């Protein structure tokens, strides 16, 4: 089975849509929303969707992702950003089928957009230095 982790921070306008998309995936048995102390209605909206909600103990998306991983109860974990509303309907299957079929150990998706400053000035140089085999990732911080 699959756990989907959705890190959030003030995503009241999109969280419902992302959760509903994930709920359509047959192999997902756990949806974790790890909130980074949102000031809007993100948590209230997610709670109404009957998913597991946790408040991150440290600020930042990375901390929320890490804490979600520690809380996950399944062997396959998918991270989806709460602010992306253009996911394909079968995004969870696209990301997990190669793992389930033993053709990949790790799957990283990307989308067609310009990389941001943090990606270009921090993430990519760090990947090149610490994990050269991952340096070719065009969107290492994307939420897929």
Locate the predicted segments by residue.
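Short glycine- and hydrophobic/aromatic-rich loop-to-beta-strand nucleating segment
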Residues: 119-120, 138-144
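Aromatic-glycine-rich donor-binding/catalytic loop that engages nucleotide-sugar donors
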Residues: 129-139
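Structured catalytic core of nucleotide-sugar glycosyltransferases
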Residues: 1-131
């Amino acid at each position: 089975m699959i756990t989907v982790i959705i890190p959030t921070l003030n995503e009241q306008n999109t969280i419902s849509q992302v959760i509903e998309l994930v709920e359509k995936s047959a192999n997902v048995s756990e949806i974790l929303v790890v909130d980074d102390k949102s000031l809007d209605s993100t948590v209230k909206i997610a709670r109404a969707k009957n998913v597991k909600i946790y408040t991150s103990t440290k600020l930042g998306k990375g901390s929320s992702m890490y804490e979600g991983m520690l809380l996950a109860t399944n062997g396959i974990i998918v991270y989806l950003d709460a602010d992306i509303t253009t996911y394909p309907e079968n995004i969870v299957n696209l990301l997990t089928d190669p793992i389930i079929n033993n053709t990949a150990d790790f799957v990283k998706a990307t989308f067609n957009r310009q990389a941001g400053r943090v990606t270009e000035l921090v993430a990519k140089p760090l990947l090149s230095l610490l994990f050269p085999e991952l340096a070719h990732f065009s969107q290492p911080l994307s939420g897929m």
